[in-house]
């Protein structure tokens, strides 16, 4: 009799376990369906104030905040990957990253990627030391200029397509953009060319006193680049969300956390 009671009790426990296990599995599926968003991997190098790590090692910056908000509105979770900027095209085409979003200029690259609409306007400029005798782009003739590799300034100085830009003496193409500024400060180069907002950020962060030439190299739009073979339509959806974020004030609020007079940047930049 005692054996039957134990067997019956064991059977009841087994049934209860099955029922509880079934309920748990059902809840797990529910949770997955409702709360886990698909991931979008955003690729950029370190490029303050657009994309960099804060003191706790977390991604932050204009592009990080814009991407987080925009993709959330589209139903995605943005995850940020620090990439070798020279390898950006290969990375997005291979699918290792979903898009390139790092102060990236559309101008001259229209046919290389699927682009979102421009979300910001900015320009490439030339800073020199405060005691320099360079005051115009024409004064760069025969001088040494540092640029980051695979950027618009490198292309501008190497292509000789712009009649305003003279033949310089030497071009220093650097993979690590942060080396350009010590080279300028030490006098190893006479000028650098880069994104205006990045230069201003560097000057503020390190107390550098450079003089930026009045005449910009180029003013263009910044966009988000997807692979040409990517047929998900994310660039179109992102463009629509950008318009939404302009209209409801979110874009101005995010840019204003990093730059003064954010409305001046909300037109359509260059790198």
What are these regions (language model features)?
Residues 64, 68, 77-139, 211-216:
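Acidic, polar ligand-binding/catalytic clefts
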Residues 20-22:
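C-terminal motif of bacterial Sec signal peptides marking the signal peptidase cleavage site
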Residues 90, 103-112, 156-159, 183-219:
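A ligand-binding cleft/hinge motif common to bilobed small-molecule-binding domains
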Residues 29-103, 173, 248:
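Extracytoplasmic small-molecule ligand-binding "clamshell" domains
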Residues 53, 67-76, 153-175, 203-207:
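Ligand-binding cleft/hinge of the Venus flytrap
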Residues 24, 64-73, 131-134, 138-152, ...:
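Extended ligand-binding regions for polar small-molecule ligands
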Residues 44-45, 121-128, 204-243, 261-271:
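Periplasmic-binding protein-like
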Residues 1-10:
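Bacterial N-terminal signal peptides that target proteins for export
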């Amino acid at each position: 009799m005692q054996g039957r009671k134990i067997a019956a009790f064991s059977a009841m426990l087994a049934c209860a376990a099955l029922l509880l296990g079934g309920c748990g599995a059902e809840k797990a599926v529910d949770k997955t369906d409702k709360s886990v968003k698909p991931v979008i991997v955003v690729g950029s190098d370190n490029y303050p104030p657009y994309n960099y790590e804060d003191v706790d090692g977390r991604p932050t910056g204009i592009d990080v905040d814009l991407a987080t908000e925009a993709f959330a509105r589209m139903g995605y979770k943005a995850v940020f990957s620090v990439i070798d900027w020279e390898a950006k095209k290969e990375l997005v085409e291979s699918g290792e990253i979903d898009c390139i979003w790092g102060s990236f200029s559309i101008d001259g690259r229209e046919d290389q990627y699927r682009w979102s609409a421009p979300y910001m306007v900015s320009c490439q400029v030339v800073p020199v030391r405060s005691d320099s005798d360079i005051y115009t782009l024409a004064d760069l003739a025969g001088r040494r200029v540092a640029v980051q590799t695979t950027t618009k300034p490198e292309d501008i100085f190497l292509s000789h397509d712009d009649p305003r830009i003279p033949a310089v003496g030497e071009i220093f193409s650097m993979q690590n953009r942060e080396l350009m500024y010590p080279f300028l400060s030490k006098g190893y180069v006479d000028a650098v060319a880069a994104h205006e907002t990045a230069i201003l950020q560097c000057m503020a962060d390190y107390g550098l006193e450079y003089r930026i030439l009045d005449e910009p190299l180029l003013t263009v739009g910044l966009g988000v680049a997807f692979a040409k073979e990517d047929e998900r339509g994310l660039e179109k959806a992102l463009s629509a969300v950008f318009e939404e974020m302009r209209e409801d004030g979110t874009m101005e609020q995010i840019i204003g956390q990093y730059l003064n007079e954010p409305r001046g940047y909300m037109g359509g930049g260059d790198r």
